[in-house]
Curated annotation (Swiss-Prot):
Residues 1-27 form the signal peptide. Has antimicrobial activity. Pfam families: Defensin_beta_2 (PF13841). The keyword Phosphoprotein does not apply. It comes from the Eukaryota. This is Beta-defensin 105A. It comes from Hylobates lar (Lar gibbon). It is found in: Secreted. GO terms for biological process: defense response to bacterium; innate immune response. Keywords: Antibiotic, Antimicrobial, Defensin, Disulfide bond, Secreted, Signal. InterPro entries: Beta_defensin_dom. The gene is DEFB105A. GO terms for cellular component: extracellular region.
Length: 78
């Protein structure tokens, strides 16, 4: 009886470890493509929600620091 319970817990733990691994599908926000209009998708806010992390800033925005990798923190020009 104890062997069955230990086996069940082991398989249960292995299942949750395998679920956490990426499936190879690149359908997340990190891999999203630009919109048809040429604007890049907004990923997240930056600097206490004072801007948006983008690949390129829009015409009415100015770069104000970096977010991650090669993304810029874009703020509205005043």
């Amino acid at each position: 009886m104890a062997l069955i319970r230990k086996t069940f817990y082991f398989l249960f733990a292995v299942f949750f470890i395998l679920v956490q691994l990426p499936s190879g599908c690149q359908a997340g926000l990190d891999f999203s493509q630009p919109f048809p209009s040429g604007e890049f998708a907004v990923f997240e806010s930056c600097k206490f929600s004072r801007g948006k992390c983008r690949k390129e800033c829009l015409e009415n925005e100015k770069p104000d620091g970096n977010c991650r990798l090669n993304f810029l923190c874009c703020r509205q020009s005043i």
